Amino acid sequence: GLGSYIIDIHDGGGAGTIVKKVPPYGLPYGVTVSADIDNLMLTGRCVSVDSVVMSSLRVMPTCMVLGEGAGTAAAMAVKKKILPADVNVKQLRKKLVENGVLDCRDVEVFT
């Protein structure tokens, strides 16, 4: 999937906001796979990223893309009787593109 929201960090102490435009970026499958529980996947704002990435990723369009990817991967894992960590990412990407999800390698970046 593809994320594209600005980096938008709000200072907890009220000192201001940091805003930075970023080009569209790919969302790696690994952020949705639990490192501790074999059959657990995470999506939306629960994925494993640092606070800077979360400041861009936290918006609903990006959360929906993560959900589409995690849901498709979960279906593939169940169908093949494998764990989420064992899903073939190339096959997942192909299925997502077939389903209409943009691949960041195919997006022209305007700055």
Regions found by a protein language model. Name each.
Residues 9-11, 52, 75, 79, ...:
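Ubiquitous "structural anchor" signal
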